[in-house]
Amino acid sequence: MRVKDTLNLGKTKFPMRGRLPETEAQREALWEENKVYEQRQKLNEGKPSFVLHDGPPYANGPIHIGHAMNKISKDFIVRYKSMTGYRAPYVPGWDTHGLPIEHQLTKAGYDRKKMSLTEFRDLCQKYALEQVEIQKKGFKRLGVAGEWDHPYLTLAKEFEAAQIKVFGAFAKRGLLYQAKKPVYWSWSSESALAEAEVEYHDVVAKTAFFTEQVQDGKGLLDSDTYLVGWTTTPWTIPASEAVAVSADFEYALVQPSGSDRKYVVAASLLGDLAQKFNWTDYQVVKTFKGAEMEGMTTKHPYIDRELLVGLADYVTDDAGTGLVHTAPGYGDDDYNFGKKYNLPIFAPMNDQGVLTAENGPEFDGVFYQDADDISLRLLEEHDALLLEEDLEHSYPFDWRTKKPIVFRATDQWFVSIDKMRDEILKAVDEVTYYPTWGKVRLRNMLKDRGDWVISRQRVWGVPLPIFYAEDGTPIMTEETINHVSDLFREYGSNVWFDREAKDLLPAGFTSEHSPNGKFTKETDIMDVWFDSGSSHQGVLAERDYLTYPADMYLEGSDQYRGWFNSSLITSVVVSGHAPYKSVLSQGFTLDQSGKKMSKSLGNVIDPNKVVKQMGAEIIRLWVMSADTSADVRVSMETLQQISESYRKLRNTFRFLLANTSDFGPENFVAYEKREAVDQYMTVNFNHFLAGMRDEFDRYDFLNAYKHLINFVNNDLSSFYMNVAKDVLYIEPEDSHVRRSMQATFYEILSGLTKLLTPILPHTTEEVWSYMDEPEDFVQLTEIPEARTFENGNALLEKWEGFMELRSHVLKCLEEARNAKLIGRSLEASADLYLTASQQELLADLGTDAGLLCGVSALSVHDASEAPAEAESFSDNAAVLVQAAKGEVCDRCRMTKEDVGSDPAYQQLCARCAKLVRENFPQTVEEGLEK
């Protein structure tokens, strides 16, 4: 018999290498085949519900790493809730309408003007559904559990029908109105945009300081006086109707030396402006308040038009001249000013951003960006240009086409936010936010939000269910809305485009505004944010196993102005409360340098590729490790580091499995009867479990990750599993000390496997398949609640004191290793010179301190006896590490002076010789081979 045959070496077929790209897919197929998600839902029937409502990603293109972070984060929470006493169904969804899909078809060669609207919409639907399948495959491959066979789609008939009812709630409350107002206009999309569809980029603009001659100065200013205006959009000057000044500002009438003109600018800006205009010598003729200028008129610099001077509180003196050129058709503030002074709302531009002849013959047919130069030339020709200079500033862009947009007055349908702002803000306060600053972010977005333009001049979307009478009166009564909703539920929204208005109205419908019984219908569609913002009705209220409001909405922080925002508004209108009880927001995924990922920069981390190379578990563990409350940097190097952490976790599972392979329920040892170190680790694990559950409950996965890695690396790998080898391998198979440790091992193995299932379901299911448990899948078990122990806190405190002592021993061992005094720790002996209280602590452990410190011999002495060469630490205590005396035992690998003391076992220490003699008596005669 060989020495190793006398050892209880752990055995398991659980592989060291996970081969994740291959095995994960097999496991996912097994889950699908066995309907594990459905089984979990059935198990949770009758339990309190927790509904995380999925914010629908846009159905266009394969999933990216931001998608992965979002969906995996949701999966953590849903799986955790499902395994801790909640019924937590998860219905994934997709946003399937909108301009990008139209663009994709145009790019593919389809011309929507050469086919019927329904034909084009059918192509859009086909494309959207194809994209849903592509993304669905990607999400499922990440291990995300949910109703993949029954997701929600904003193009679904029942969703569209519910959305029409939401629109009806706005109509019923009188919150909808039609107006010609400046809106964000995307010439590249040929449509109005909502605030949530706009992003800002820094651009360099041509700015102009220009003059307008006073025509009627109200006795305060003469006709040789010129008001100095400033604009960052010279192309809007042809549409100028007025000059805005601040009532409270002090304005200066300035006469530059050698000039026959006088100029008016804000007094606070005069110093800077004089420098800009090279007014080296000038006289301030007089100063006056802006309020005195109200009602004056000036001449347009190059068009035969009189301009009004009026008062506005949006005028500032932090840039420009303190006098603002005002074109009511090209800006929100300008529009409100125009309404106040009854000015024409003039925006002479077509849908493609091309100026019309109303601007003047020079501008007819000119793209607005090219019109800057024409306007500047005309200013110069009319001696009205004081200065042209470039300015870098933030400018709005269409978030989808990445092209600049304009403010342009067009006829649109709006939701009046002002009428319900107080209700909306009250609803904000009733929600819990993770992180807490989310409340302020959302509140500020809604506090300052303008009216919501909900009409879009596009084809692929849900039509505005508005009819028009013969005299132009809009019709959207409860009767017509409900009828359209019913039609959509039966036929889908294509019916709106297929039928005439009369065939979409209820049978026999009449209106006093249509004496001849003729009606027309609206051709615009709804903003897609109205689509997704209605999902609380289209999904939560539509499916009886979900709850409204949802327990949580979880999305990127951009959704404070997007989905969180639109959903809140629609929900308040429909039911008077928020659609969610809590909101969790996340940052964006960036590359390792903090840059946005883009194919052109070559810095994209493609989750589909990572899954094929490394496995979904690596992405999942990375998500757990990331501070998702802020922007998250990720690179292949990051994922490589995470794969190292994964390898340690996997090896831990493997060690626990191997060393419990011969352990069954009949071998169980109750906590009270366990050895001291096992009692400590039982309490310690439950303390860890309680902390992890608390962090999961608070959605603090980052700290949970830190605690997990710390527990696995330090408590298990560096300490307990190290100590365990001497017990599990060396002691008799059925000895109490070994079974005590195995009982603890198994509890940790079982608890850790269940606890990590929300995070690493592929791996924990693999581990579970090697455990002898009644449930076929670990997902169908419950995460255990942490146990409490009567002496638990005192025990942890005592062992914490010992761990402090042990850390000093380990430090000295490392120094001895570096000095080549020893190789392995078991080649060392340690002499501890301790205070009385420290000696008492060691004696009270009830365990061999040498074994716990990983040395072959440990002696305890009084602190006063410490020799000079001993390394001191707290309370005058000291440690002296030396090479252990004796020979290495072939069985336990300890260095002992009693090796060979039993003549039958010359290569074994006395302890091992005794154990072998008792358990393998045949070896006394046969002997042992190395």
From Swiss-Prot:
Its cofactor is Zn(2+). A motif ('HIGH' region) lies at residues 57-67. One of its GO terms (cellular component) is cytosol. A motif ('KMSKS' region) lies at residues 596-600. GO terms for molecular function: aminoacyl-tRNA deacylase activity; ATP binding; isoleucine-tRNA ligase activity; tRNA binding; zinc ion binding. Keywords: Aminoacyl-tRNA synthetase, ATP-binding, Cytoplasm, Ligase, Metal-binding, Nucleotide-binding, Protein biosynthesis, Zinc. Binds 1 zinc ion per subunit. It is found in: Cytoplasm. It catalyses: tRNA(Ile) + L-isoleucine + ATP = L-isoleucyl-tRNA(Ile) + AMP + diphosphate. L-isoleucyl-5'-AMP binds at E555. Its main location: cytoplasm. HAMAP family: Ile_tRNA_synth_type1 (MF_02002). Monomer. This is Isoleucine--tRNA ligase.
